[in-house]
Amino acid sequence: MSATLLVPSMTVKAADTIYNNKTGNQDGYDYELWKDTGNTSMTLNAGGTFDCSWSNINNALFRKGKKFDSTQTYQQIGNITFDYGCDYRPNGNSYLCVYGWTVDPLVEYYIVDSWGTWRPPGGTPKGQIQVDGGTYDVYETTRYNAPSIQGDTTFKQYFSVRTSKRTSGTISVSEHFKAWERMGMRCGNFMKPALNIEGYQSSGSASVYKNNMTIGGSSSSSGNQGGNQGGNTGNENAGNNLVTVADADKIQCETMTKSGQYTGNISSPFNGVALYANNDAVKYTQYFASGTHDFTLRGCSNNNKMARVDLKIGGQNKGTFYYGDSYPAEYTIKNVSHGTGNQTIELVVTADDGQWDAYLDYFNNSVEPGCSLVPGAVVVLVALGSSSNTGNNSGTNTQNQKLIALTFDDGPSSTTSQVLDMLEKYNVKATFFLIGQNVNSNTASIVQRQVKMGCELACHSYTHEDMTKMNASQIRNQIDWTASAIKNTAGVDVKFFRPPYISVNNTMYQNIDLPFIQGSMHNDWESSTSASQRVNSVLSSAKDGDIILLHDFQGNSQTVSALPQIIEGLKNQGYTFVTVSELFEMKGVNPNVEYKIWSNVK
C-alpha cells in the first residue's frame, strides 16, 4: 500500500447525531450504530472521534474504523494500529475495545482495554501475551448457530483482554493477530476493524476524543507502547484523520533517480514507477556499515506474465525479484552480501521479452544504525533485518569436513519417538519437516523433545496436500498455520520448507518466504522397500553436502530399523551429521535463492 493520506480535506461543520441503526462513512472512517432495543445516540465528530450514550438496551454498539473487502490477510494489508483516548463511563456490562471479523475462517475478535462490571469473556485463558507495554489474557470460544456477518452459523471468537484497565493508548491490532496465530488460533482475511464501545443490558456514555487508525508501516514487535506513539508524532495534527504510515517509513519509487529509454511514473495500480524495456532502471546510493542485509520491494507485473527485476549492488547482480501477476505484492531477497561504505544500488530490467512490464511501488524504510543517506543522494535503499554474516561463515575448521544432514518428513507420530531414540543413542541431530495438523496436544511432548535434543523443526505444510493446486492465499495459510502450531508448541521458528510430494510451481515460490528443501530420496515411504535396501540406497549415493530425505510417519518401522546401519555407515565414511541450518552455515552458502529447491549444499 502506498503511503497515501486516505482522507480528503475537510470543511468544518456541525457534528451529526444519529439515534437509530445506521452505517456510513465520514472523514474517511466507516461508522456504525447498532442496537436491538432501547435508547441510543451517537454524535459523529471529526475523523475517528465520536460521543455516544445508551440506556434501557439489550445490546448496542458504537464504532468507527475501516471496512476491508475480505480479500486480504492482515499480513497483506500491513500493520494496523489504533491510537486512541476515551472518557469512558459505563454503568453495568460494557466493553471498550477494538472489534472486527475475519473470514476463511470466520472469526469475531475483540481486543479489550477496558470494561464495566463484567470482565469478558469468562472462562480460562489459553495464555498471556505482551503487547503495547501491557499484558493481555487470550481466550478462544465457539459460538454455535449464532448471528454473524454471514448469517446464523457456527464461528470462533478470539479475545485479548488487558489484565489492567486503561482508556487511552495504542492498540497494535496486527501484533495481537501474530500472537494468536503463534497460539494456533487461525486468522483469516480482514474485515472492518474498528474502535468499539459496546453495551449489554446496561447504560452509560463515552466520549472518544482521539481515534487515529494507521495502516501500514513498521511492526511494534517490541510491545513498547511508547515506541508506537512516538513513531506517530509526525501525524499529531492528523488526530481526526484516517492515516497511513508516515512517509519516513516508506521510500516511494517515483521519487527515485530514473534511467533507461522508457522508465516513467505510473498512477495505477499504485503511485510508482514502470520499467518497460531492457535497461530501464532506478538507481540509489546507500551507506552500509555492515555487509549482509535483506532487501524488500513491492511491485507487480502489468499482466499475468512473469516480470523480473534484477537487484544490483556495486555493479554486481545480487538476485532477482519475480512478480507473476498484476496483484501488488512484497518480495524479499534475504541475506544479500555486498560491499560496505557508499554503494550504488540499481533495480533494472534485463530479461524483457516484450510481453510484460514491471511496476515498482516502494521499499520499506528501516535503516539500521550505521547506515545513512549519502549527501546529495536522491533516495536510500532500505536495509532490513540483521547484519549477520551467515553467508560468509566457511572457515578452515569446517571447509574440509564431510557434512551430511538427515531429515525426516510427515511427523510427528509415535514413530518419531523411535527415530529420536536412535538419534539419541548415536548422539546425532536431524531436521524434522512437520505436518502442521499433526502438531497437537497428543504430540506436543515429542516436538518438545526434538528441540531439547538439538534437532531442527521445519515446515512440510499443514494438511500434506498437493500445494500446486492451491491459490496464493491457501498456500500462505498452509505455511502460517504450520509455523504457528510449531511456535506455540515448541517456541521455535521454522526456517525451511519441503513441499508435499516435492511438487512445486511459481505460485508457491512467490508466496512462501522460506528456502525450499528437497533431498536425496530412498523410497522409504514404500512398504516394499526393505530396511537393507534403504541402508544400501543411502550409503551408496551419499555425497558431501547431501540432504537425506527419510520419513517418520506412523508405522514406518523399516526406516527405524535401518537407522543404526545408516548412521554407523555414514560415520565410517567420515561424515559429520548436522542440521539443515548448520549445513548451509558451515558450507558458507546462502539458502535464500529464488526459484531453487536444494538437495545438496556445496
UniProtKB/Swiss-Prot annotation:
Temperature dependence (free text): Optimum temperature is 38 degrees Celsius.
Gene Ontology MF terms in the entry: carbohydrate binding; endo-1,4-beta-xylanase activity; hydrolase activity, acting on carbon-nitrogen (but not peptide) bonds
Domain CBM6 as annotated: residue spans: 249-366
UniProt key word Acetylation: no
Keywords: Carbohydrate metabolism, Glycosidase, Hydrolase, Multifunctional enzyme, Polysaccharide degradation, Secreted, Signal, Xylan degradation
Pathway(s): Glycan degradation; xylan degradation
Post-translational modification: In the later growth phases, seems to undergo a proteolytic cleavage into a 30 kDa protein possessing xylanolytic activity.
Predominant cellular place of this UniProt entry's protein: secreted
GH11 domain: residues covered: 17-211
Record's keyword annotation contains Hydrolase: yes
UniProt-listed InterPro entries: CBM6, ConA-like_dom_sf, Galactose-bd-like_sf, GH11/12, GH11_AS_1, GH11_AS_2, GH11_dom, Glyco_hydro/deAcase_b/a-brl
GO cellular component: extracellular region
GO biological process, one term: xylan catabolic process
Gene3D superfamilies reported in the protein's UniProt record: 2.60.120.180, Galactose-binding domain-like (2.60.120.260), Glycoside hydrolase/deacetylase (3.20.20.370)
Signal sequence residues: 1-14
Localization in the cell: Secreted
Biased composition range(s): Gly residues: 224-233
Homology family: Belongs to the glycosyl hydrolase 11 (cellulase G) family.
Official protein name in the record: Bifunctional xylanase/deacetylase
Organism: Pseudobutyrivibrio xylanivorans
Lineage of producing organism: Bacteria, Bacillati, Bacillota, Clostridia, Lachnospirales
